[in-house]
Amino acid sequence: MVIAIDGPAASGKGTLARRLAQHYGLPHLDTGLLYRAVALALLDAERDLRDEAAAEAAARTLRAESLGDARLRERAMGEAASLVSALPAVRAALLDWQRRFAAAPGGAVLDGRDIGTVVCPDAPVKLFITASPEERAHRRHRELGGRGEPVAFEAVLADIVRRDARDADRAAAPLRVADDAVVIDTTALDAEAAFRAAAAVVEARWPGRG
């Protein structure tokens, strides 16, 4: 059983994906970390984030251990990853990586921007998690504050809006709702309510897994 979860930044898809993976005993991949890791490799090498050849090389040599680097969670890496993820060669280089993960015996949970549309188009469970830009900005603002990264709410909202536009408008694998995905708007939902809504979808497609 592959559970494909897509959605914009700070929609709650990562929290939900981790909870579903834990509940159903499946491995989980936050595919956004792959793009953050590529961006970090470029920054460490003092290369331009728009250098497609260098970014592709970094993507093709990416090691799973690099996904544990604490720097990947920093706010600046989100913007850097958004730039790198717009490069077609990088998306192509990481596609096999993601598909191999999804092919794990028993299934997997993957979350990102193009899981249900490109990476796992045949996934039996596809969820698209969204929320209003303002609510997503509030969540990210609280998260950053909790990590000791104080930043103005207006700056966080502007970053969310900018990343939404870039994700939706890029030529390679733009963010969109898969035709057979179930949309869950978490604007007014807490994490538990979002989990219950998602689990109901999973169990309708995967009977007996409560």
Curated annotation (Swiss-Prot):
Its main location: cytoplasm. It holds the Pfam family Cytidylate_kin. ATP binds at residues 7-15. Keywords: ATP-binding, Cytoplasm, Kinase, Nucleotide-binding, Transferase. Its EC number is 2.7.4.25. It catalyses: CMP + ATP = CDP + ADP; dCMP + ATP = dCDP + ADP. SUPFAM superfamilies: P-loop containing nucleoside triphosphate hydrolases. It is found in: Cytoplasm. It is an enzyme of class 2 (transferase). One of its GO terms (biological process) is pyrimidine nucleotide metabolic process. InterPro entries: Cytidylate_kin, Cytidylate_kinase_dom, P-loop_NTPase. One of its GO terms (cellular component) is cytoplasm. Belongs to the cytidylate kinase family. Type 1 subfamily. This is Cytidylate kinase.
